[in-house]
Regions:
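Recognition helix of helix-turn-helix/homeodomain-like DNA-binding domains
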Residues: 29-44
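Conserved hydrophobic/aromatic packing and binding residues within compact polymer-binding modules
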Residues: 10, 24-25, 35-38, 64
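Short, conserved catalytic or interaction motifs in soluble domains
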Residues: 40, 59, 69
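A detector for short, charged/polar N-terminal pre-domain segments
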Residues: 1-5, 70-72
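Short, charged recognition helix plus adjacent turn
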Residues: 55, 63-72
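Short basic helix-loop element that most often maps to the first helix and adjoining turn
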Residues: 8-27, 52
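Short, basic-rich loop-to-helix N-cap that marks the start of a DNA-contacting helix
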Residues: 42-54, 71
């Protein structure tokens, strides 16, 4: 569940910066396939990878986890 929310947040931040998955992959130093897996919540970056994603997206690491919780 957290992995899925993180992936959606990364995709949201990427789109807000008008980056393609290819551009983000190049900035992060990974494959486009990995970016796709992360954004779909199938895979998650390592702790070190979170720092790399945050630099590429020009946000603090905590901003990667700034997603809204749904009220039940």
């Amino acid at each position: 569940m957290l992995q899925r929310k993180l992936g959606k947040r990364i995709a949201e931040l990427r789109r807000a910066r008008k980056l393609t998955q290819e551009q983000l992959a190049e900035a992060v130093g990974c494959s486009v396939e990995f970016i796709s897996l992360v954004e779909r919540g199938v895979n998650a970056p390592s702790v070190a990878g979170l720092e790399t994603f945050s630099r590429a997206l020009k946000v603090e690491v905590k901003e990667l986890f700034a997603f809204e919780e749904k009220k039940r």
